[in-house]
Regions:
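Phosphate-binding site recognition
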Residues: 1-202
Length: 202
């Protein structure tokens, strides 16, 4: 997958994941860190009061890493540590610092946030070329179907019918229409979808 490719890149950029709130950005980043790294440092610029002070001094890598280590009091091993800067739109200096942290190369960095575009103008020297920006969206209808237990065989049948201009079997057609109507109401936010899957209550 693309995250595996990013993990193994030489001279990798910071990964910047942007998207609406509550679509699962933080959850998927934590899971990725658990699988791929020995050490994981997470900073949330909304929840971690005072975190912005990490980036108030000089923006050179050594100073920032010293501040980060003092703030989190966690082990940071070069090549084995992922630093996750969540809600980074709240700390423009952190976005500026990414250039120097990426050039330093000791650790990997993932940024995540909402409304990043709104705050671009607040960044004094946005480091173009040091971020790989990925947009994340709510679940689409196919993902919603999978979450509700629709099997691969159903997708295969649908594709066959589409490619060969055949009618979709009646039971399958009616089931999918009901699920589509439900999707219109429930939407694609992962927590809401999971609640529906667990309770079937709208």
């Amino acid at each position: 997958c693309s995250s595996d490719l990013w993990r193994t890149q030489k001279n990798k950029k910071a990964l910047c994941i942007i998207g609406a709130r509550q679509i699962g950005k933080t959850t998927i980043i934590r899971e990725f860190a658990k699988q791929e790294y020995e050490n994981f440092i997470e900073i949330n610029f909304i929840l971690d009061k005072g975190a912005e002070k990490i980036f108030e001094d000089k923006l050179d890598a050594d100073t920032i890493i010293e501040n980060l280590t003092a703030f989190k009091m966690q082990k940071m091993e070069p090549g084995k540590t992922l630093v996750f800067l969540d809600e980074i739109q709240e700390c423009p200096n952190a976005r500026c610092a990414i250039k120097f942290l990426v050039e330093d190369g000791r650790f990997d960095y993932i940024e995540s946030g909402s409304l990043l575009g709104v705050r671009y103008k607040e960044v004094p020297s946005y480091a173009v070329g040091f971020e790989e920006i990925v947009s994340m969206y709510p679940m689409n209808f196919r993902e919603f179907l999978r979450a509700n237990g629709v099997q691969d065989t159903t997708f295969t049948t649908l594709q066959f019918c589409y490619e060969n201009h055949n009618e979709v079997p009646t039971v399958m057609h009616e089931t999918l229409l009901k699920l589509f109507a439900t999707y219109i109401v429930v939407g694609g936010m992962p927590d809401v979808v999971q609640t529906y899957v667990d309770t079937h209550d709208i």
